[in-house]
Amino acid sequence: LGDPSRNINYDKIQAEHDLKKYFGISKVIFIEGIPDGDLTKGHIDGIARFIETRTVVVVQCTSNSLCQPNSKDAKIYDNAAKIIEEAGFNVIREPIEGFVQYNNQKFDTNYMNWLVGNGFVIAPGFGNSITDAKAKSRIESYFPNRDVHIIEMLSSWAAGGGVHCHTNDQPAFSLQQG
């Protein structure tokens, strides 16, 4: 649901009903709040990601990131981790180890917006060899049987989208001959 300017007439009750009906799930966990530094305005793929059936990775602010520990954003991420853990899942925290400046914008190096494919994971890169390498190593530990690739996506990230955003929900359509 995220940003209040989206899905104006769609509430949690309807969302939970639809998720259970159309996806056959039994439990829905709602995460509250939109981090100020979240360019996607509350998309879950920048906050928490499943890596196994019972394990969820949740982002964590650090003293090197724009979202500082004990900030509003940190409290949103910490609360998300708590809610997910209380729902019975294992939680791993994914540190935001820095930030970048690109086209007069500053944003955190949040590597959560990855794509998982058959035998591979592609994660956004931020052109910082140190944080990109550390993130790659962590993501490899989350997905030990997959090849992990970090791809620099600064212009895309600055526009509010990452790897998962660009590859999710590809519509099926047929080309019409003219």
Language-model regions, residue ranges each:
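The feature marks the mature, well-folded catalytic cores of soluble enzymes
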Residues: 1-178
